[in-house]
């Protein structure tokens, strides 16, 4: 699947391991196979945008701890850029630890609620084996490069 390959490539290009951060989460939105937005979490710095997402979507954890998750930052940036979100768009979420290994990145309960509340259902995420799961069907994507969605 081209969108997964594009996300992996972009994530490793942005990956900058430090001792302060044990892993990085990345999220990418696609319109067809075109990447329209790419984001990364920031577990160190609070952000008013994360707080605003918590307010707008009634997510108390984001209000209490206003740190962007990659998914919430993706939604915020998509709304800033397009003022709307299409249910036809796909989202790929992945995590890379400081050693460069792809790990599980299934969206947390709050991020899942947020993604679904804006109509995004085509969500793909990495597992601890470095494979990707189709979040809608809960099936592993066998060969991420050859499958088209």
Where do the model's predicted regions map?
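Zinc-dependent deaminase catalytic domain
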Residues: 1-149
